[in-house]
Amino acid sequence: RDASSRFHPSHRWGNFWSVGAAWIVTKENFMSGTHGWLDMLKVKASIGSQGNDKIGDYRYVDTYRLASSNGEMSVAFLEKGNPNITWETNTNFNAGIEFGVLQNRISGSIEYFNRKTTDMLMAFPTAPSLGYSSYYANVGDMSNKGIEVDLNFTPIRSKNVQWDINVNLTHLKNKIISLPPERRTKEVEGYYGYAGSSFFYGQGLPLYTFYMKKYAGVSEDGRSMWYKDVTDKDGKPTGERTTTTAYSEGSDYLCGNAIPDLYGGFGTSVSFFGFDFGINFNYQIGGKIYDSGYAAAMSTPTSTGSIGVNWHKDILNAWTPENPNSNIPRMQYGDSNTTDTSDRFLIDASYLTLQNINFGYTLPSKFTQKFGVGKMRIYLACENVFYWSKRKGLDPRYADNTDNQGVLGTSNYATYSPIRTISGGINIQF
């Protein structure tokens, strides 16, 4: 049982619990016939709940700020509060196995997880005419289901040589299970929910589903085009689409989501006659990210203040009468819609990073003991060696969100990728 001062006293307390069990099957008598090849087999399961109150302070009351003008102080409205918000609850179920075979030359774990989130805490957007843009509310339920696999291999193991390989992967499916009626204010492609920023939160959809205009290329005179629904006399879509050069007339569509299909890491290490070498990679496959940095670098000048700004090299391939087949609109002073939000700037968020490389040598003990040293290792290491992504300069790991995990799906060029570091040293044990 826990309480949080971030909620109204009437909703401050929450009850959370957990229980788990494991069974080492290989210790049972009926498994005695497998001891020649099966070293360990464990079956495990757990279920429990935990609360989330990470929404900031005083979200349950209206807040105000002091403002100064011409030496006079006044009180101005800051944020809208909601006294009904309460704990977001995550109920986690995990079940899996751990195993080791062939003298643990092959070992690992396989685990299924099902995480259900109820009473999701999110900022709910409102009409600007209300005097505030959003307020926090418990907006619905969500599930994350998937599988985690961790495998370890030792192809070579001898007195002086050992080679290890490790691979891990995670696959998950995210879905909004339910939204209360007051949140189902809009229907998009058969899903009911609400729109906020560049996302649509709908029942049956992943949480971070992009909702924006679809880019349709350039017109014959080089202007940007967007798709637009054809409607009947009652204003209802007929299922057909046309194009328009007016951004405000373009229709919004579901454009994929930011959650990857697969992510994890892999690596290998080798030790031989005192030398050791290791290398590790991280990866992500699938998901989308909105590359706002690229959009800014492809914008056209809108004022004299644009003098001196730089562009991406792709701008050199923009439409011109001599280059009529380009998919990049013409450079036109004052065109403020060229880089407005659309799936033109959505990009595959897959990446591969060479996380670290290390190399070392451990001196023979018969040599170090002459100096009263039990063990001495000389090493050289490099961290954050390299990463590959769909576009040079784009690092999907550092998106515009609070946990820097790239989940929110919006690039943030104000956040630098980790710097590459090269280090070396000597480890001494007495």
Model-flagged regions — what are they?
Residues 26-41, 102-105, 156-163, 176-181, ...:
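Short loop/turn motifs that connect adjacent beta-strands in outer-membrane beta-barrel proteins
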Residues 32-89, 107, 111-142, 195:
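Solvent-exposed loop/turn elements at secondary-structure boundaries
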Residues 60-61, 68-107, 135-158, 204-207, ...:
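Outer-membrane beta-barrel signature, preferentially recognizing the C-terminal barrel domain
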Residues 4, 284-377, 382, 400:
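Extracytoplasmic gating/loop element in the C-terminal half of outer-membrane beta-barrel translocons
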Residues 139-144, 189-221, 316-318, 323, ...:
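C-terminal beta-signal and terminal closure region of outer-membrane beta-barrel proteins
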Residues 1-5, 25-27, 47-51, 103, ...:
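Transmembrane beta-strands of outer-membrane beta-barrel pores
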Residues 19-23, 95-99, 110, 149-153, ...:
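Residues on the lipid-exposed face of transmembrane beta-strands in outer-membrane beta-barrel proteins
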Residues 137, 154-258, 298, 316-320, ...:
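Conserved small-residue
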